[in-house]
UniProtKB/Swiss-Prot annotation:
GO molecular function, one term: FMN binding
Active-site residues (renumbered): H281, R304
Catalysed reaction equations from the record: succinate + NAD(+) = fumarate + NADH + H(+)
Needed co-factor(s): FAD
Residues involved in FAD binding: 37-51
Organism name: Saccharomyces cerevisiae (strain ATCC 204508 / S288c)
Gene Ontology CC: one annotated term: endoplasmic reticulum
Family: Belongs to the FAD-dependent oxidoreductase 2 family. FRD/SDH subfamily.
Deleted gene: phenotype: Causes increased sensitivity to hypertonic growth medium.
Protein encoded by which gene: OSM1
Miscellaneous comment: Present with 432 molecules/cell in log phase SD medium.
Role played: Irreversibly catalyzes the reduction of fumarate to succinate. Together with the second isozyme of soluble fumarate reductase (FRD1), essential for anaerobic growth. Involved in maintaining redox balance during oxygen deficiency conditions. Reduction of fumarate is the main source of succinate during fermentation, and under anaerobic conditions, the formation of succinate is strictly required for the reoxidation of FADH(2).
Protein name per the record: Fumarate reductase 2
Length: 501
């Protein structure tokens, strides 16, 4: 009898212990025992993916970046992020729809790319803007109309910070705050360069191989990896392979932008798409103190979207519709301006300055933009025209009662009707620059990487978002769609990993 009671007691004790263990492991302790998702790259795509995985799904993340700081190229984005039919547009009485945004995107893509990805990009743009506003308290309350857009839809916040910096700062701060409270939920590892992905015999991800800051080869065990490693706009080697006619141009890309993700994934059997489609941005600033530097500050497209115009550097005359698509404006500069220095003058009114004060002040602090009188503009840039003739040119552009000579669709913040040779303007020298690579690894609508010569996925555990992927923009990306792509497909990658995790 006593033995039976003891046996029952032991069984009950074991049962209770099992229940307690299960309950313990079902909480945050279990999170620490799961293999993390590895996110490669800390630009906006990587930050979006990481925040979504952690905040919505409590899935642990290791964020790896070979650079010494967070942000990638996203942190330098200066015009904003696109969205159609957003609350901001409705508040500012701008009529827009995802369908119109898609029409503009397809027109800019010129028959290249994957239309279903463009459809996703534009349809989910409103929710992307709202996610940034609600999750990270970003205002995104101002709009600009950039080249190739039918209406103003490129969002930025009123305040002192450029949009890329503001967005990256907000998302990275949230990650760092979470990491400080629970290092098991998120680890941020900089100076860590990913060199390979380990797969088992069935093609499932088992680990990420990387070199740590001391040059040691290490393996991070994981079943899911998201490539957010950016494009290849800094790599002369890859430009020579895919777009050799552009290797002589300067670039806006950081030194980390060398196509590592494309190389690794291609070696694993991923399909590459549109690799020859490299965007040349028409306006990179020429530093008057370092004219030959291969790296250029981007002259934000918002400078033209908010009213800036381009003048021929010899004649002082306008020569193009400044709000055409980037490839068209680039072609106009290269074909109509002197070929020996491949430049134009970007000229802006006081009203443009008032609408973009903080950014222009930054450019002025770098000596990239000067505030000068019309007379001084003629003298300093050795224009073969008179100050009076230039005043006439600026007045002609500013006359909203006549059709624009170059069919510019939006004329705002124009020059005063009483402008004179003593009036001041803002001016900078600009030149076309390698800016963005539309090509990359092919993905589907779930952000999964596609296998070469197939529509099947490379592996259920491999995803990509941002500039590392291709097909989202076709032959030419619209300004403001780079940051949008990062948010839309970064969120998508996180949501679909959560279904598999």
């Amino acid at each position: 009898m006593i033995r039976s009671v003891r046996r029952v007691f032991i069984y009950v004790s074991i049962f209770v212990l099992i229940i307690v263990l299960k309950r313990t492991l079902s909480g945050t302790d279990q999170t620490s025992m799961k293999q993390p998702v590895v996110v490669i790259g800390s630009g906006l795509a990587g930050l979006t993916t990481s925040n979504r995985l952690i905040s919505k799904y409590r899935i642990p993340v290791v964020l790896l970046d070979k650079a010494a700081s967070i942000g990638g190229n996203s942190i330098k984005a200066s015009s904003g992020i696109n969205g159609a039919h957003t609350d901001t547009q409705q508040n500012l009485k701008v009529m827009d729809t995802p369908e119109l945004f898609l029409k503009d995107t397809l027109h800019s893509a010129k028959g290249r790319g994957v239309p279903s990805l463009m459809d996703k990009l534009t349809k989910e743009s409103k929710s992307a803007i709202r996610w940034l506003q609600t999750e990270f308290d970003l205002k995104l309350d101002l709009l600009a109309q950039l080249g190739g857009h039918s209406v103003p839809r490129t969002h930025r916040s009123s305040g002192k910070l450029p949009p890329g910096f503001e967005i990256v700062q907000a998302l990275s701060k949230k990650l760092k705050d979470i990491s400080s409270k629970d290092s098991n939920l998120v680890q941020i590892m900089l100076n860590s360069e990913v060199v390979d992905i380990e797969l088992d015999n069935q093609g499932h991800v088992t680990g990420v191989v990387y070199m740590d800051e001391n040059g040691n080869r290490k393996i991070m065990k994981s079943h899911h990896v998201v490539f957010c490693s950016g494009g290849f706009g800094y790599s002369k080697e890859m430009l020579k392979e895919y777009s050799p006619n552009l290797i002589h141009l300067p670039t806006t890309n950081g030194k980390q932008t060398t196509g590592d993700g494309q190389k690794i994934l291609s070696k694993l059997g991923a399909e590459l798409i549109d690799m020859d489609q490299v965007q040349v941005h028409p306006t990179g600033f020429i530093d008057p103190n370092d004219r030959e530097n291969n790296w250029k500050f981007l002259a934000a497209e918002a400078l033209r979207g908010l009213g800036g115009i381009l003048l021929h550097p010899t004649t002082g005359r306008r020569f193009t519709n400044e709000l055409s698509t980037r490839d068209t404006v680039t072609m106009e500069i290269q074909s109509k301006c002197p070929k020996n220095d491949n430049r134009a003058l970007l000229v802006m009114s006081d009203k443009v300055y008032e609408n973009y004060t903080n950014n222009i002040n930054f450019y002025m602090s770098k000596n990239l933009i000067k505030k000068v009188s019309i007379n001084d503009l003629i003298r300093q840039y050795d224009l073969q025209t008179t100050a009076s003739e230039l005043v006439t040119e600026l007045k002609s552009y500013s006359d909203v009662n006549t059709k624009d000579t170059f069919d510019r669709p939006l004329i705002i913040n124009a020059f005063d009707k009483d402008i004179s040779t003593e009036s001041t303007v803002y001016v900078g020298e600009v030149t076309p620059v390698v800016h963005f690579t539309m090509g990359g690894v092919k993905i589907n609508e779930k952000s999964q990487v596609i296998k070469k010569n197939s529509e099947s996925v490379l592996s259920n555990g491999i995803f990509a978002a941002g500039e590392v992927s291709g097909g989202v923009h076709g032959a030419n990306r619209l300004g403001g769609s780079s940051l949008l792509e990062c948010v839309v497909f970064g969120k998508t990658a996180a949501d679909n990993i959560a279904k598999l995790y």
